[in-house]
Design a protein with these regions (language model features):
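Metal-associated gating/positioning segment near the N- to mid-region
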Residues: 43-114
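Glycine-enriched alpha-helix->loop->beta-strand junction motifs that scaffold or abut catalytic
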Residues: 152-156, 238-245, 260-266, 290-294
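Histidine-rich, glycine-flanked metal-binding segment
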Residues: 1-49
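C-terminal cap of metal-dependent C-N hydrolases
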Residues: 11, 29-30, 329, 333-334, ...
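His/Asp/Glu-enriched, well-ordered alpha-helical/loop segment
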Residues: 261-271, 275-356
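Active-site glycine- and acidic-residue-rich loops that bind
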Residues: 133-144, 229-232, 237, 245-247, ...
Length: 383
C-alpha cells in the first residue's frame, strides 16, 4: 500500500522535547522524515499530534454483534470498527475480546471467530489492529491447550479477569442479572447458576493452574496483564508470575504497589471524562495527579482518549505533552512498540490532525496512509 509523501506546514505540531510548536512535518515512506519532501500542504488552523495508541478497548462489540446476534460476515464488522477507530484519531488499537463463562459474544467460540476476523482483515486496513484475550481465570476446563490456541489466533497480549460473583455465591444467594446472563449465553438460569457454583467451588485449584498457564504464555513471548486489581497483595501475586501490566486497578493501594514495583498502570479514559469511576473505584484523575498512570485506554468508548487528554490539559493537571503522552508514547511503551508514539524522524508517520478551534478530529494517518479525513481539510490535500 502506498504511503503519502508530503510536507505539512502552518500547523501547530506536538514535537518531542519541544512541545506544541509551529513547525513543518514531513512524512514519506510511512515515516516521519528529517528533510522536506513531496508537495507542501498548508495546515494553518490545525493541530498535528501523534496518533493515539489504544491499549484496551471492547467498544467493538456493538459492531460485530448488533442486537445480540453475531454478524454473518464478521470481517465487515471489524472494518466498521476500524472506521470508528480512525474517526477518533486512533492509529493502533488493542481489541480486547473476552474468553468468558458469560457465553454469547463473550464466549470461547465467539472469541475464536473474532480473532480469525481480525487476522483476515489485518493486511487490508490502515489502523494497526492488535488482538487481546481477556481470560476468565476460573474456567479451569479451558486451560488445557489454551496457549496453543492463543498462538494460532496470533494473540500477543493476554489479560486475566475474574468476574465471578464470589460474594453472592459464597452466601448461596442468586447473583444479580442471572436470568439475563443465562439467556444471552443460551442456557437455562438453572444450568447457568450450577456452572457458576461449580467454578466457585473449585476456586482453590485456580492459583496452581495459573502458575502453569502464565509460565507457558511467557515462554511464547505473550504480554501479560491483570484486570481490576483490588489490593497490593493481588498485584504482588500477579507480578511474581510475570504479569507486569495492571489494567484499571480498583484502589490506590493496588496502584501504588504497581508503581513501587515498576509495573505498568493502565487507567480508563472514560473515568477521566466522567470525573470518576462508574463503579465507585479509585478516581483516574486522583491517580494521574499522584503519578500513578502510564497510559489511558478507551475501555468501552473510543472518543474518550482524545477527550481525556484535552480535559487533563484544560484543567491544568498536565500540560499537553504530558497528557497526550498518556494516549500515545505511554501506551506504545507498554506494548513495546518503539516505532511509534512520537512525531520524530524515523518513527512511523502515525498522526491525528485536529481542528485547532474545536479540537475535533479531521484527519488520521497510520504509517503515512490516510485512515480518516473529513470536511474542508480534504481540499487542502487534493489541491
Amino acid at each position: 500500500m502506498t504511503a503519502l509523501e508530503v510536507t505539512l506546514s502552518g500547523a501547530d505540531v506536538l514535537l518531542p522535547d519541544v512541545g506544541l510548536s509551529r513547525a513543518n512535518l514531513t512524512i514519506a515512506d510511512g515515516q516521519v522524515q528529517q528533510d522536506p519532501a513531496g508537495p507542501q500542504v498548508d495546515l494553518s488552523g490545525y493541530t498535528v499530534l501523534p496518533g493515539i495508541v489504544d491499549l484496551h478497548g471492547d467498544g467493538f462489540e456493538r459492531h460485530i454483534a448488533p442486537r445480540r446476534g453475531a454478524m454473518k460476515q464478521m470481517d465487515e464488522g471489524i472494518l466498521s470498527v476500524e472506521a470508528e477507530l480512525a474517526a477518533n484519531g486512533i492509529t493502533t488499537a488493542v481489541l480486547a475480546q473476552f474468553y468468558s463463562w458469560e457465553g454469547g459474544v463473550r464466549g470461547p467460540a465467539f472469541a475464536s471467530q473474532v480473532f480469525d476476523a481480525i487476522a483476515a482483515v489485518k493486511g487490508s486496513v490502515v489502523t494497526d489492529l492488535i488482538p487481546q484475550l481477556r481470560f476468565e481465570t476460573h474456567m479451569l476446563d479451558d486451560y488445557a491447550g489454551l496457549p496453543e490456541r492463543i498462538a494460532r489466533w496470533q494473540v500477543p497480549y493476554v489479560v486475566f479477569n475474574d468476574h465471578l460473583p464470589h460474594g453472592r455465591l459464597a452466601q448461596s444467594r442468586t447473583p444479580p442479572r442471572l436470568t439475563g446472563q443465562a439467556l444471552k449465553a443460551g442456557r437455562s438460569p438453572e444450568t447457568h447458576l450450577e456452572m457458576l457454583q461449580t467454578m466457585h467451588a473449585r476456586r482453590g485449584e485456580v492459583p496452581a493452574a495459573l502458575e502453569v498457564l502464565c509460565s507457558d504464555l511467557a515462554d511464547l513471548g505473550i504480554r501479560l496483564g491483570s484486570h481490576d486489581d483490588a489490593t497490593a497483595e493481588a498485584r504482588a501475586w500477579w507480578r511474581a508470575r510475570g504479569v507486569s501490566v495492571a489494567e484499571f486497578p480498583e484502589t490506590l493501594d493496588a496502584a501504588e504497589a504497581a508503581r513501587t514495583a515498576g509495573d505498568y498502570i493502565i487507567l480508563g479514559s472514560p473515568n477521566v471524562v466522567r470525573g470518576g469511576s462508574h463503579k465507585g473505584n479509585a478516581s483516574a484523575l486522583d491517580l494521574i495527579a499522584m503519578g500513578l498512570c502510564d497510559a489511558l485506554a478507551s475501555d468501552y468508548h473510543y472518543p474518550s482518549p482524545r477527550r481525556a487528554a484535552l480535559m487533563l490539559t484544560k484543567s491544568g493537571l498536565l500540560d499537553l505533552a504530558g497528557a497526550w503522552a498518556l494516549i500515545s508514547s505511554g501506551p506504545a511503551k507498554v506494548l513495546g512498540l518503539t516505532d511509534r508514539g512520537a512525531l520524530a524522524p524515523g518513527k512511523r508517520a502515525d498522526l491525528v490532525i485536529l481542528n485547532a478551534e474545536n479540537h475535533r478530529v479531521v484527519a488520521t494517518m497510520a504509517g503515512g496512509r490516510v485512515s480518516y479525513m473529513s470536511g474542508d481539510i480534504a481540499a487542502r490535500f487534493i489541491t
